[in-house]
From Swiss-Prot:
Gene: sepS
Role: Catalyzes the attachment of O-phosphoserine (Sep) to tRNA(Cys).
Swiss-Prot/TrEMBL catalytic activity: tRNA(Cys) + O-phospho-L-serine + ATP = O-phospho-L-seryl-tRNA(Cys) + AMP + diphosphate
Organism: Methanospirillum hungatei JF-1 (strain ATCC 27890 / DSM 864 / NBRC 100397 / JF-1)
This protein's UniProt keywords: Aminoacyl-tRNA synthetase, ATP-binding, Ligase, Nucleotide-binding, Protein biosynthesis
Name this protein carries in UniProt: O-phosphoserine--tRNA(Cys) ligase
SUPFAM superfamilies from the UniProt entry: Class II aaRS and biotin synthetases
Alphabetical list of InterPro entries matching this protein: aa-tRNA-synth_II (IPR006195), aa-tRNA-synth_II/BPL/LPL (IPR045864), O-Pseryl-tRNA(Cys)_ligase (IPR005246), Phenylalanyl-tRNA_Synthase (IPR002319), SepRS_C (IPR041590)
Length: 531
């Protein structure tokens, strides 16, 4: 809360020790949602693949490579130019782009009659002619598919819903359409774009040329598995110049991967021999990391002059590439690339701390006096916890909601303690389970290794009582709050977020907050004469 600085300055000069001890009085008691572990300051989590892309971009830029964007749609002819006789085997793994053909729609008497029936009127001669012209323009691709309904609604002077009905019932040709493949493919590897890019610029820019690109590639795998996806990201670069050799690949690999903590490197001949590389230049890069050990992280090679000649490129070119998803798997110690990339489709895993943040209270006071009442109730209850009933203790006397209120913690039953055995239980999350446990040897493991929610049964019950007393005070009436046997979270004013309950259910975990609370709190409104 905002406090009076002049008052504290004065009090500090008069009695420093007293003023210092009064410091906590300026703090507004927090609601449960503003208490740790519910109160958090979290950095939003980046997706591991895009976090890796970001780091790779920064690493490439730091070692002097300029960023480029290569064509993502590649004509199959480019694959023949790059791979030569090997092209057919490569094309077996690419995705061809296809589309729906434009139907040749005929309009005869039968079609006109059906349209008239749907519209509830006869088409005029001008409307018939305009309809034919519009469908013909669509056939010639002068009108886009997503604009056809709009154009027809203008021609036939009706709304889009009627047009959709006409297309469905009168022109079955649209429903019978089947996709037809083109000769265009989706890029299966970044190399298919580098040849085109280098062919366009190699004679127009200074050498050596150093470019990188990080983007999607698409490969028609037989099936996706824990290490392969049909759509993945490639982090690729080229160095082109008169004096480029295989040594450039080694130097670039070291410079790039050192940014990720790799220290030692080995370069091994790759058994795979892509025809767009020179013989004996395709090389696998293995690197050592303090956490990951030796792992294969990249491949490089020198482009074949046969392939370069197809694009008129007359200088040696070194190409290095690595799979972003593979790098992300290594960095995150992931076992399944599908789960790494698409965690939303896999079971969610929460830590005990994250689950504890989803446990709070159903009801609590809204005002500062009401929040202070909670403290008073707890202090009074703890102080007299072993008192035997019938007994009653004043916990609070003061103003709430403009009314003078007196509040008691009491036990009306004979030979019963003021607090039930479970009142001092505290809510912990341990191995995914939500448990209400006492401070005993039996539950030492839970209290030591679990995560406390910061909520005890007494705190939860006192908060509920304070909220109800606060509400009753607004109406100027007394109230009594009794918490008896707890069987469910709601019995002790406990709120568990739906996502937490779903996690507990999905993983066959448990919520156990059972226990005898037996706490009675009563308020009364004081007459003006007693104030």
């Amino acid at each position: 809360m905002i406090f009076d600085t002049e008052e504290f300055k004065k009090r500090g000069k008069e009695d420093f020790e007293s003023a210092w001890h009064a410091g906590p009085s300026v703090l507004t008691p927090p609601t449960t949602d503003l208490m740790y572990p519910r109160l958090t300051y979290l950095r939003a989590q980046a997706h591991p693949v895009f976090e890796t892309i970001h780091r790779l971009r920064e690493a490439y830029l730091a070692i002097g490579f300029q960023e480029a964007e290569n064509p993502i749609i590649v004509d199959e002819q480019e694959v023949y130019r790059q791979f030569g006789p090997e092209a057919m085997a490569v094309l077996d793994r690419v995705f061809y782009l296809g589309g729906l053909p434009r139907p040749n729609v005929g309009i005869g008497k039968e079609q006109i009659q059906k349209i008239n029936s749907i519209l509830g009127r006869d088409l005029s001669e001008d409307e018939e002619e305009s309809l034919r012209k519009t469908l013909h323009a669509y056939k010639k691709s002068e009108i886009d598919g997503d604009e056809l309904a709009y154009e027809l609604s203008g021609v036939l002077h009706t709304d889009d819903a009627r047009i959709v009905e006409i297309l469905d019932r009168v022109f079955p040709e649209f429903r019978a359409l089947k996709p037809e493949s083109s000769r265009q493919t989706l890029r299966s590897h970044m190399t298919s774009g580098w040849f085109q890019t280098l062919g366009a610029i190699w004679e127009k820019v200074p050498h050596p040329i150093r470019l990188f690109s990080i983007d999607r590639c698409f490969r028609r795998e037989q099936a996706e598995d824990s290490h392969r996806l049909m759509s993945y990201h490639s982090a690729s670069c080229v160095v082109a110049g008169e004096y480029v050799t295989i040594e450039d690949g080694k130097a670039v690999a070291r410079a790039l991967l050192s940014a990720f903590g790799y220290t030692d490197f080995e370069f091994r001949p790759d058994d795979k021999r892509s025809k767009y590389y020179m013989p004996d230049t395709q090389t696998e890069v293995y690197a050592a990391h303090p956490d990951h050990g030796w792992v294969e992280v990249a491949t490089f090679g020198i482009y074949s002059p046969v392939a370069l000649a197809e694009y008129g490129v007359g200088i040696p070119v070194m190409n290095l590439g690595l799979g972003v998803e593979r790098m992300a798997m290594i960095m995150n110690k992931a076992k399944d690339v599908r789960e790494l990339c698409f965690p939303q489709f896999f079971p969610i895993r929460y830590t005990d701390t994250e689950l504890a943040a989803g446990v709070s209270l159903l009801a609590e006071p809204a005002t500062t006096p009401g929040k202070n009442l909670v403290r008073s109730l707890i202090n009074t209850a703890v102080t007299h916890s072993t008192a035997i009933g019938p007994c009653s203790f004043v916990a609070f006397e003061g103003e709430i909601a403009g009314k003078q209120i007196r509040v008691y913690v009491e036990e009306p039953e004979e030979n019963a303690k003021l607090l039930g055995p479970a009142c001092m239980n505290e809510i912990f999350v341990h191995k995914g389970a939500i448990l209400g446990v006492p401070d005993t040897e039996k539950f030492a493991e839970v209290r030591k290794n679990g995560i406390s929610t910061g909520i005890s049964y007494l705190f939860a019950a006192a908060s509920q009582a304070a909220a109800e007393i606060e509400q009753a005070a607004h109406f100027g009436i007394p109230t009594t709050v009794q918490i008896k046997m707890a069987r469910l979270p709601g019995d002790i004013n406990l709120k568990i977020e739906p996502w937490v309950m779903r996690y507990i259910t999905d993983n066959n975990l448990k919520t156990d907050v059972r226990g005898p609370v037996f706490l009675t709190i009563r308020s009364e409104v004081l007459p003006t004469s007693e104030v």
